Amino acid sequence: MEAVIFDMDGVLMDTEPLYFEAYRRVAESYGKPYTEDLHRRIMGVPEREGLPILMEALEIKDSLENFKKRVHEEKKRVFSELLKENPGVREALEFVKSKRIKLALATSTPQREALERLRRLDLEKYFDVMVFGDQVKNGKPDPEIYLLVLERLNVVPEKVVVFEDSKSGVEAAKSAGIERIYGVVHSLNDGKALLEAGAVALVKPEEILNVLKEVL
């Protein structure tokens, strides 16, 4: 293997519960309920596509601009209070670097938000290549973000390992020709859906290091 590619939210960081809480608070402010099923519909999807989905599903009668502003304010509040890295992730990143294997990030999160979180947790330093959601025209499940990462890494899909926690992310990697995709499971995603999308196996964040020791 020549490279390892990580998604960010839900894989490197325990962020999905934070997204859920932020969206729940915003939905509640409109008098609407927010469910885990609805949250799964937008997991791994770029915000520019996810917010209109939420507005329609919640039947929110407001401008997208106002809704987006409220979401950003709530996300900033929640993330500043509760952001933390997933257990075992730093050790996994250190292991990859010790093997002199390239590390890349492929996240649907916009660059400014993503870098703020990576720097807060001191994780940015590990990555050779980073591609963000606002740097591609088509978000996951379109393969564009993974094709761009592969191009910047200058590696072929057969020489890459991917860790993703969303159905759309697994589908994106699969469509880019990558086969060795591990589905990272947590409290807010659906492991069965990850396998159906093409993940070769399911792992918890703290198990990523052991997987890497086997495949690298």
From Swiss-Prot:
InterPro entries noted in UniProt: HAD-like_sf, HAD-SF_hydro_IA, HAD_2, HAD_sf, PGP-like_dom2
Transmembrane segments: none
A UniProt-annotated Pfam family: HAD_2
Keyword Glycoprotein assigned: no
EC supergroup of this enzyme: hydrolase
Keyword field contains Isomerase: no
Family statement drawn from the similarity comment of this UniProt entry: Belongs to the HAD-like hydrolase superfamily.
PANTHER family: 2-DEOXYGLUCOSE-6-PHOSPHATE PHOSPHATASE 2, PSEUDOURIDINE-5'-PHOSPHATASE
Top-level taxon in the UniProt lineage: Bacteria
Record text on cofactor binding: Divalent metal cation. Highest activity with Co(2+), followed by Mg(2+), Mn(2+) or Ni(2+).
Enzyme Commission numbers on file: 3.1.3.-
Cofactor dependency: Co(2+); Mg(2+); Mn(2+); Ni(2+)
Protein keywords: Carbohydrate metabolism, Cobalt, Hydrolase, Magnesium, Manganese, Metal-binding, Nickel
Residues forming the catalytic site: 7 (nucleophile)
Role of this protein: Displays high phosphatase activity toward erythrose 4-phosphate, fructose 6-phosphate, 2-deoxyglucose 6-phosphate, and mannose 6-phosphate. May have a role in the intracellular metabolism of many phosphorylated carbohydrates.
Protein name: Phosphorylated carbohydrates phosphatase TM_1254
Coiled-coil portions: none
